């Protein structure tokens, strides 16, 4: 209204990994044509995954993929800290942790595998990995991640009011 007419608008939420072509951008159009939205998607394709989303889901998507890089960075840092505590040099621990996250994500996406399936494929009965997973579960790792996403979502809603 302030602009004096109806103009096409594309609302989007990119995340920081778009800087290296491995990001996620959710978007929706207001007063846009399918051709404009298609052109937009083509224009941004080098940024990573470009996903058209219902407007009412943008805040939830932002909590997962917009805030997710920070959550993932905390996980990578903690994993590296554990490696340092076990005797690895910091630079190697960080490199191993980051590459492991990248590779696990790639494996999941390329094989269309559920994360639980990948976890189960690494956990040998009575082995080291299942003991680590047990510790993560005992310490509330899964719940902490879920609550972090919900907190980010709720803050996004509050900021929009």
Predicted regions located by residue number:
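Internal alpha-helical scaffold of NAD(P)-dependent oxidoreductase catalytic cores
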Residues: 2-8, 24-61, 72-110
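Short pre-catalytic strand/loop immediately N-terminal to key active-site residues, enriched for Gly-Thr
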Residues: 9, 58-63, 115-120
């Amino acid at each position: 209204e302030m602009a004096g007419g109806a103009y096409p608008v594309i609302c989007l939420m990119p995340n920081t990994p778009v800087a290296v072509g491995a990001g996620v951008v959710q978007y929706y159009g207001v007063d846009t044509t399918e051709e404009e939205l298609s052109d937009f998607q083509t224009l941004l394709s080098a940024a990573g995954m470009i996903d058209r989303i219902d407007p009412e889901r943008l805040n939830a998507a932002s909590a997962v993929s917009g805030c997710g890089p920070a959550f993932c960075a905390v996980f990578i840092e903690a994993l590296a800290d554990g490696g340092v505590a076990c005797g690895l040099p910091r630079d190697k621990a960080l490199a191993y942790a980051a590459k492991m996250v990248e590779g696990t994500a790639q494996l999941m996406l390329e094989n269309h595998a559920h994360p639980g399936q990948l976890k189960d494929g690494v956990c040998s009965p009575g082995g080291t990995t299942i003991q680590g997973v047990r510790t993560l579960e005992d310490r509330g790792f899964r719940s902490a991640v879920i609550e972090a996403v919900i907190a980010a979502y709720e803050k996004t809603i509050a900021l929009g009011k």
